[in-house]
């Protein structure tokens, strides 16, 4: 859309290439910066909107913001930074991206040491939100806390990689933090 700093489409989890997206009337919502933050922090719905693969970005934004090199989950921080530099987004309700789960994907493998980088990403977002968008600091903090529980949940669902030697110490850290965040 003309004037938008980035555009996004809906995604659908698919099991095979024959799966058809639901048919619905095409609608494009134009969001201001507040609307973008609401969407990023899942205040408007419970979908995850902080990945890069369902978006197209205006070149000028990409000259100001870079991916956090070498990090897993780098697109989460990237999109947080994009919103800080954007004024308008065009969001389509049409499914144009199909997310195929496979057993060897990062999402479905056992926990590895690099999964702990999610905590570092959300910690940085929580710190940056104090300056960039203070009204969302609580939401950023909740996502930081949720990252701890998410790694524990992944370990229960998919197990832990045999190569993760520090898992027991990290597991104890995650349990202690989760208890403090949610039960103290």
Where are the predicted features?
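Amphipathic alpha-helical repeat scaffolds of TPR domains
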Residues: 142-154
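Short, charged, amphipathic alpha-helical segments
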Residues: 137-143, 165-169
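Alpha-helical elements of Rossmann-like donor-binding domains used by nucleotide-donor carbohydrate transfer enzymes
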Residues: 81, 120, 124, 169-173
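Secondary-structure edge/capping motif, primarily at the C-terminal ends of alpha-helices
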Residues: 103, 129-133, 154-162
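C-terminal, non-catalytic tails of nucleotide-sugar-dependent glycosyltransferases
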Residues: 34, 120-141, 177-184
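Donor-binding/catalytic cores of nucleotide-activated saccharide
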Residues: 1-90, 100, 104-113
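Membrane-interface aromatic/basic loop that binds lipid-linked glycans or pyrophosphate carriers
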Residues: 3-4, 158-184
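Glycine- and acidic-residue-rich phosphate-binding/metal-coordinating active-site segment common to enzymes
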Residues: 90, 95-132
């Amino acid at each position: 859309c003309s004037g938008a700093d980035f555009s996004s489409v809906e995604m659908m989890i698919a099991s095979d290439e024959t799966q058809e997206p639901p048919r619905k009337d095409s609608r494009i919502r134009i969001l201001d910066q507040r609307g973008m933050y609401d969407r990023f922090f899942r205040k408007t719905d419970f979908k995850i909107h902080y990945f890069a693969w369902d978006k197209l970005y205006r070149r000028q934004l990409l000259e100001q913001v870079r991916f956090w090199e070498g990090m897993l989950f780098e697109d989460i921080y990237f999109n947080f930074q994009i919103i800080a530099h954007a004024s308008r987004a065009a969001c389509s309700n049409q499914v144009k991206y199909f997310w195929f789960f496979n057993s060897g994907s990062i999402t479905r493998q056992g926990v590895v040491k690099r999964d702990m980088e999610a905590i570092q990403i959300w910690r940085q977002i929580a710190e940056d939100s104090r300056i960039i968008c203070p009204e969302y600091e609580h939401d950023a903090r909740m996502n930081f806390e949720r990252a701890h529980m998410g790694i524990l949940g992944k370990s229960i669902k998919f197990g832990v990689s045999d190569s993760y030697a520090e898992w027991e110490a990290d597991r104890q850290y995650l349990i202690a933090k989760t208890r403090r965040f949610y039960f103290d």
